[in-house]
Design a protein with these regions (language model features):
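Short hydrophobic beta-strand segments
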Residues: 1-2, 78
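Alpha-helical substrate-recognition element adjacent to the catalytic core
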Residues: 2-62
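Short secondary-structure boundary/hinge segments and terminal tails
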Residues: 44, 66, 106-108
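Short polybasic/polar patches that bind polyanions
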Residues: 49, 69, 90
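Output/docking surface of receiver
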Residues: 56-63, 97-103
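Conserved Lys-Pro-Asp/Glu-containing loop-to-beta segment of HAD-superfamily phosphomonoesterases
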Residues: 60-84
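Acidic, Mg2+-coordinating phosphoryl-transfer loop and its flanking beta/alpha structural elements
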Residues: 77-111
């Protein structure tokens, strides 16, 4: 699961509905997790480090296809809050979810 930050994660600006505990749960369930944002890679890594979450990738939005090249998975998902997020996700072959839509798909008990 690739996460946008702003408007998606609770630590974003603006904050989104995906909590860091939900990200941890996804990782515990075996998902490959990371972020794809217009924030710098250094800033993305600092966010994850601050919250003690080890991610497998941090990329800029236009580099999402590199994640697909790097990891062999049965499905590729990106959670973001804008049309731009959706455009980059679909261009890279990822299924796109808005944050509130992702709740029922990845965290059904969180609704």
């Amino acid at each position: 699961i690739s996460f946008d930050i702003d408007g998606t994660l609770e630590v974003g600006d603006p904050p989104g509905c995906i909590t860091m505990d939900m990200v941890r749960r996804a990782k515990d369930l075996g998902f490959i997790i990371g972020s794809c944002s217009d924030r710098t890679v250094t800033n993305q890594r600092n966010i994850w480090r601050t919250h003690d979450i080890e991610v497998e990738f941090t990329v800029l939005k236009h580099q999402l296809e590199l994640v697909k090249e790097q990891f062999d998975a049965s499905e590729y998902n990106h959670i973001g809050d804008t049309n731009i997020d959706q455009q980059y996700a679909e261009r890279a072959g990822f299924t796109f979810f808005l944050p509130d839509q992702s709740l029922q798909n990845f965290w059904p008990s969180a609704e």
